[in-house]
Amino acid sequence: MGRAFVYVILGGGVAAGYAALEFTRRGVSDGELCIISEEPVAPYERPALSKGFLLPEAPARLPSFHTCVGANDEKLTPKWYKDHGIELVLGTRVKSVDVRRKTLLSSTGETISYKFLIIATGARALKLEEFGVEGSDAENVCYLRDLADANRLATVIQSSSNGNAVVIGGGYIGMECAASLVINKINVTMVFPEAHCMARLFTPKIASLYEDYYRAKGVKFIKGTVLTSFEFDSNKKVTAVNLKDGSHLPADLVVVGIGIRPNTSLFEGQLTIEKGGIKVNSRMQSSDSSVYAIGDVATFPVKLFGEMRRLEHVDSARKSARHAVSAIMDPIKTGDFDYLPFFYSRVFAFSWQFYGDPTGDVVHFGEYEDGKSFGAYWVKKGHLVGSFLEGGTKEEYETISKATQLKPAVTIDLEELEREGLGFAHTVVSQQKVPEVKDIPSAEMVKQSASVVMIKKPLYVWHAATGVVVAASVAAFAFWYGRRRRRW
């Protein structure tokens, strides 16, 4: 027995939900679209799992964070899918895919065929066993990738109040889970091999400010070392962790966040794999024209930097999903996916956003002493390529986004750039209007050339310099095509 659909989305994470919403808005007919997911629930916003889901009071629970509430859009409950004629095949694993025949075989033995396939399989959490450490199956060792993981972690947290937790990893999951554990009145020690937290993105100066705040909340840091083994009680529950530097840490709970690996195994040998993900073009189309890939599993061209990237963040998942559906449903009017890499996080009283690429010379600016509002620029080969801001307003975040998208030449020295701070970004934007990047660029969009910014007088955050006169053609373009870019 088998079923046939025009469109099949394989995977049930964030990207799948946003793709489904885009399909309905582009006129998909009842019965044409199917979503196949190993999870037993409809697509949901994964960021909630390390934040609201772990709160000790009034924690977030489904259906409150089904997609697409994370972008202030519709909440896609199971009823929504039914009302729109979308087939949800949940709790089902696909054990093989035949790209040439355009078929999928489920673990139940059902064959599902498609005309177009969107791969939204995401990624899996790396396990300690892959690094030679046994014991991940202990009841108080927790990962956090899906709803089942979150439920397990929440249960262990409830039984560990005033106890000791060891968080392995200093990235997104480690930092956000550590904050949640503190809120739950658990003593936290973070362990990671790098010199500072969020090493792939933060500079040492930025990291030190966040680490100092965490320390003030009682969090301890052990850096430059790794976990080597666990100690267990008679019930095979972890009681302590041993580190390579000889440290011995008591543990009632262990949270592991040591990275992810894209779920590409079904397509290896059938589609081109690059940088760990499925290689796609600027329309999110793989080496097979009927197969698209979106979200964490996709390696796509980032036009701003002229190279292939695989990005692990919810914003990329949301926007790549919309673009892939646009390319399938309206190929003539859909242009290239012109994505500006974007990362953000909210922990304790902090809220930061980053745009672009954290490479090149770093210039810090703002009020690092009080930790309320500060930022950084990354300058590579004389151009602005990355911007970070903590504690900004919505308008300030939009400004650094637009400035980074322009990739302007920096003609002032770095010391002056530090003094200018946010004023530099304001000047970039005021001197040259940016055709704001749409979630789904149209084929008619014209790529604007990089701007050159020359600043003669110091500026302050609240005083944007007077913009230069923009050519009439550019002004007309901005009028017709410019519209506010959504950041949430």
UniProtKB/Swiss-Prot annotation:
Source species, domain of life: Eukaryota
Binding sites annotated in the UniProt record for NADP(+): Y172, I173, G174, M175, E176, R200, G259, E312, H313, Y344
Full protein name: Monodehydroascorbate reductase 4, peroxisomal
Protein task: Catalyzes the conversion of monodehydroascorbate to ascorbate, oxidizing NADH in the process. Involved in the detoxification of H(2)O(2) that escapes the peroxisome and causes oxidative damage to oil bodies.
UniProt cross-references to Pfam families, sorted A to Z: MDHAR3-like_C, Pyr_redox_2
PANTHER family noted in UniProt: APOPTOSIS-INDUCING FACTOR 1 (PTHR43557), RIESKE DOMAIN-CONTAINING PROTEIN-RELATED (PTHR43557:SF2)
EC number: 1.6.5.4
Subcellular location, record wording: Peroxisome membrane
Peroxisomal face residues: 25-458
Binding site for FAD: G12, G13, V14, A15, E39, R46, K51, R145, D146, D296, V314, Y344
Names of required cofactors: FAD
Catalytic activity: 2 monodehydro-L-ascorbate radical + NADH + H(+) = 2 L-ascorbate + NAD(+)
SUPFAM superfamilies in the cross-refs: FAD/NAD(P)-binding domain, FAD/NAD-linked reductases, dimerisation (C-terminal) domain
Organism expressing this protein natively: Arabidopsis thaliana
Residues binding L-ascorbate, per UniProt: R318, R346
Keywords: FAD, Flavoprotein, Membrane, NAD, NADP, Oxidoreductase, Peroxisome, Redox-active center, Transmembrane, Transmembrane helix
GO biological process, one term: hydrogen peroxide catabolic process
Gene Ontology terms, MF aspect: monodehydroascorbate reductase (NADH) activity
Chief site of localization: membrane
Phenotypic consequence of gene deletion: Conditional seedling-lethal phenotype due to the unability of the seeds to break down storage oil to provide carbon skeletons and energy for early seedling growth.
